[in-house]
C-alpha cells in the first residue's frame, strides 16, 4: 500500500514539475519576514487616513443626528405661550437640535473606525502592531507633565500630532528640551 507522499513522489518522477510548485508555494507562505510589512511611513499615512475618516464620519453623523431630531421636532405640536422647563419653546427646540448634533458628532469615531477597518482590512493587523509599538515609544519617551508652566508647555503628551518620522524626531527633541528646561528651573 502506498502512502500519500510516496504517491506524490512516484507521480513527480513521471512529471518532475509537480513537486517544484508545491515547494515554492510553501516557501512563500511560511517565510519568516512578510514581503509587504508596514513601514513607518505607511503607518503614519494610514494613521492620517484613519483620523480623516473619523473626522468626516463625525461631521456626517452630526448632520444625521440633527436631521433626525429636526424631523421629530418639526412634527411636534408646541404651544408658544407655554414654557418648557421654564424656557421658551424655541430655546428648548434649538437646544435639542444642538444636543442631538453633538451626540451624533461624538458617535462619529465609532462609525469611522468601522469604516477604516472595512477599507483597510488587509493591512489592519500590521497597522495595529505598529500602533502598539508607536504608543510604547510615546509612553516611554514622553515627559513628566507635573512641571509644566506657561513658559514651558508639555510637547504633545499623547503624541496625537505626530504624522511622520520627521515629526516624531522633532517631538523627541522637544521632549528632551522640555525635560532640560524643567530640570534647570527646579
From Swiss-Prot:
<keyword id="KW-0809">Transit peptide</keyword>
<keyword id="KW-0813">Transport</keyword>
<keyword id="KW-0811">Translocation</keyword>
<dbReference type="GO" id="GO:0030150">
    <property type="term" value="P:protein import into mitochondrial matrix"/>
</dbReference>
<comment type="similarity">
    <text>Belongs to the PAM17 family.</text>
</comment>
<protein>
    <recommendedName>
        <fullName>Presequence translocated-associated motor subunit PAM17, mitochondrial</fullName>
    </recommendedName>
</protein>
<keyword id="KW-0999">Mitochondrion inner membrane</keyword>
<dbReference type="InterPro" id="IPR013875">
    <property type="entry name" value="Pam17"/>
</dbReference>
<dbReference type="GO" id="GO:0001405">
    <property type="term" value="C:PAM complex, Tim23 associated import motor"/>
</dbReference>
<keyword id="KW-1133">Transmembrane helix</keyword>
<feature type="transmembrane region" description="Helical">
    <location>
        <begin position="53"/>
        <end position="73"/>
    </location>
</feature>
<keyword id="KW-0472">Membrane</keyword>
<feature type="transit peptide" description="Mitochondrion">
    <location>
        <begin position="1"/>
        <end position="30"/>
    </location>
</feature>
<comment type="function">
    <text>Component of the PAM complex, a complex required for the translocation of transit peptide-containing proteins from the inner membrane into the mitochondrial matrix in an ATP-dependent manner.</text>
</comment>
<keyword id="KW-0653">Protein transport</keyword>
<comment type="subunit">
    <text>Component of the PAM complex, at least composed of mtHsp70 (SSC1), MGE1, TIM44, PAM16, PAM17 and PAM18.</text>
</comment>
<keyword id="KW-0812">Transmembrane</keyword>
<dbReference type="Pfam" id="PF08566">
    <property type="entry name" value="Pam17"/>
</dbReference>
<feature type="transmembrane region" description="Helical">
    <location>
        <begin position="83"/>
        <end position="103"/>
    </location>
</feature>
<keyword id="KW-0496">Mitochondrion</keyword>
